[in-house]
From Swiss-Prot:
PANTHER family from the UniProt entry: BATTENIN (PTHR10981:SF0)
Highest taxon in the source lineage: Eukaryota
Annotated source species: Eremothecium gossypii (strain ATCC 10895 / CBS 109.51 / FGSC 9923 / NRRL Y-1056) (Yeast)
Entry keyword Magnesium: no
Family: Belongs to the battenin family.
GO biological processes: L-arginine transmembrane transport; lysine transport; regulation of intracellular pH
Signal sequence range: 1-29
Source taxonomy: Eukaryota, Fungi, Dikarya, Ascomycota, Saccharomycotina
Entry GO terms, CC: fungal-type vacuole; vacuolar membrane; vacuole
Protein name: Protein BTN1
Length: 412
């Protein structure tokens, strides 16, 4: 097999494996907490540990060898899913936290690994993370809603997936050709066309530490923080705010509003043959959302959107429409709501891919690597805020529905 295709395939699998459990856990939120507790509790447990890992990892992650990280991914995510499958809420939350830590470490690890290969590795990783959303939500719907496999057994099956990270060890031979040399020297690497080019190796942490050794540590730290803040400041308005707000609105929909977008299930109603339980509707919403995300994340090469704030406005309108639906029940067709959820996913995926494409095209080369890494935390921050708001929002919506004769949000 062509080496470039092989690398693409391996990193595609790494992206899939690293993100699929995050998606499965969100899809299973209604089954983990039941109909009476807010689903945003699961979103919070699923995103907060990963978010914290991304914040602190730059200070220590370079000291941890890759093979140790891979074994930690397998242990954390595998054991975490075993706990999630236990069926006890407290134990499930602990398992979700472990899986979330694994996801955060995995994202940092594999993004760093792409440095040792041509750009095809980064393309494979990005595509795999998009595929994880669709695969995870669809597989969970297939196992629980269609095949009727019990939730605990379905979640137990997913605990096997982290073993696939062992594929990393087949990269060792390939990686040696891209090992960085000491600062000031040169190494050979492949560009996107497969030809060999000469690149100066990046400065190492040791090099930077030596530069700071002659200055007081506190002064050096203060200077570094000031420089970093200046670099971040120019990214906030054009990239970080629109991306974070899109994710804020869409995850408010997914975890705060969607659990209340229920319809009656009985003979003579259009949903009776498609859905057997109310939780099936919620799982279907998740699958459609991930389908939209996958489609739009894969369309960046032929559909380009420069106005990122337009996507934020459109996603906000989706939130408003679905809030009105949850409160007043103005739309009596589940198909219309499913179409809106699919459209919501399209907007979310488009915001993600176009944000980073815009950075790649607009930001100077010297700042591009930093900018891509810095802006990547925007989606997590928006999701995190949505989790806190959703914990309060869903009970309010569901309580109002029960009072107005629509108790479906409390039923299984």
């Amino acid at each position: 097999m062509d080496r470039r295709k092989l690398i693409f395939g391996k990193f595609w699998l790494f992206g899939l494996l690293n993100n699929v459990l995050y998606v499965v856990i969100l899809a299973a939120a209604v089954d983990i907490v039941g109909p009476t507790l807010p689903k945003s509790l699961i979103l919070l447990a699923d995103i907060l540990p990963s978010f914290l890992v991304k914040l602190v990892a730059p200070f220590f992650i370079d000291r941890v060898e890759y093979h140790y990280r891979i074994w930690s991914l397998i242990a954390l995510s595998g054991f975490g899913m075993l706990l999630v499958a236990s069926g006890r809420l407290g134990v499930c939350i602990v398992g979700i936290v472990l899986a979330s830590i694994s996801s955060g470490v995995g994202e940092i690890t594999f993004l760093q690994l792409t440095h040792y290969f041509s750009h095809v590795a980064l393309n494979g990783w990005s595509s795999g993370t998009g595929g994880a959303g669709l695969a995870g939500s669809f597989l969970y719907m297939l196992l629980t809603s269609i095949l009727k496999i019990p939730v605990s057994r379905s979640l137990l099956l997913f605990s096997i997936l982290p073993i696939g990270f062992l594929l990393y060890f087949t990269l060792q031979v390939e990686r040696t050709a891209y090992e960085p040399l000491a600062s000031g020297h040169f190494m050979e690497a492949e560009d996107n066309s497969g030809s060999v080019i000469s690149l100066e190796a990046p400065r190492t942490t040791v090099d930077n530490a030596r530069d700071c050794a002659s200055r007081p540590r506190l002064a050096a730290l203060r200077e570094r923080i000031e420089v970093t803040m200046r670099r971040l400041k120019v990214l906030v308005v054009p990239y970080m705010i629109p991306l974070s707000t899109v994710y804020l609105f869409e995850y408010l929909i997914n975890q705060g509003v969607s659990p209340t977008l229920m319809f009656p299930i009985h003979e003579g109603y259009g949903t009776s043959q498609l859905f057997h339980k109310y939780r099936d509707i919620y799982v279907a919403y998740g699958t459609l959302y991930q389908l939209g995300v996958f489609i739009s994340r894969s369309s960046g090469s032929w559909v380009r959107i420069r106005g990122l704030y337009l996507l934020s406005v459109l996603q906000f309108l989706n939130l408003v429409i679905l809030l009105i639906q949850s409160w007043y029940y103005v739309i009596h067709s589940v198909w219309v709501i499913m179409a809106i959820v699919l459209y919501e996913g399209l907007l979310g995926g488009a915001s993600y891919v176009n944000s980073f494409l815009n950075i790649s095209e607009d930001v100077p080369l010297a700042e591009r690597e930093f900018s891509l890494g810095a802006v990547s935390i925007s989606d997590s921050s928006g999701t995190l805020v949505a989790a806190f708001i959703g914990i309060l929002l869903e009970p309010v919506l569901c309580s109002h529905q029960v009072k107005t004769g629509r108790p479906w949000c409390q039923l299984e």
